[in-house]
Amino acid sequence: LLRRKSHDHAQNHDGDKCLRGASLGYYQSFLNQYKPQCILNKP
C-alpha cells in the first residue's frame, strides 16, 4: 500500500528521485531523504 501510494505520487510529480526510491523498495530511506519534496509537496 505504501509503495503503491508513493509510486502513484511520484508519477503525479516530476520526481525521478521519488520514483527511484519507491521502485527500489527503500521506502524508509527514500522517505527520510526526500520527505520535503515527495511528501510535503503533496498537492
Curated annotation (Swiss-Prot):
Protein name listed in UniProt: Snake venom metalloproteinase crotalin
Note: Negative results: does not induce thrombocytopenia after injection into mice.
Keywords: Disulfide bond, Fibrinogenolytic toxin, Hemorrhagic toxin, Hemostasis impairing toxin, Hydrolase, Metal-binding, Metalloprotease, Platelet aggregation inhibiting toxin, Protease, Secreted, Toxin, Zinc
GO terms for MF: metal ion binding; metalloendopeptidase activity; toxin activity
Domain Peptidase M12B: 1-43
Lineage of source species: Eukaryota, Metazoa, Chordata, Craniata, Vertebrata
Cofactors required: Zn(2+)
Cofactor details (free text): Binds 1 zinc ion per subunit.
Tissue expression notes: Expressed by the venom gland.
Cellular-component GO terms for this entry: extracellular region; host extracellular space
Annotated binding of Zn(2+), by residue: H13
Subunit structure: Monomer.
UniProt key word Ribonucleoprotein: no
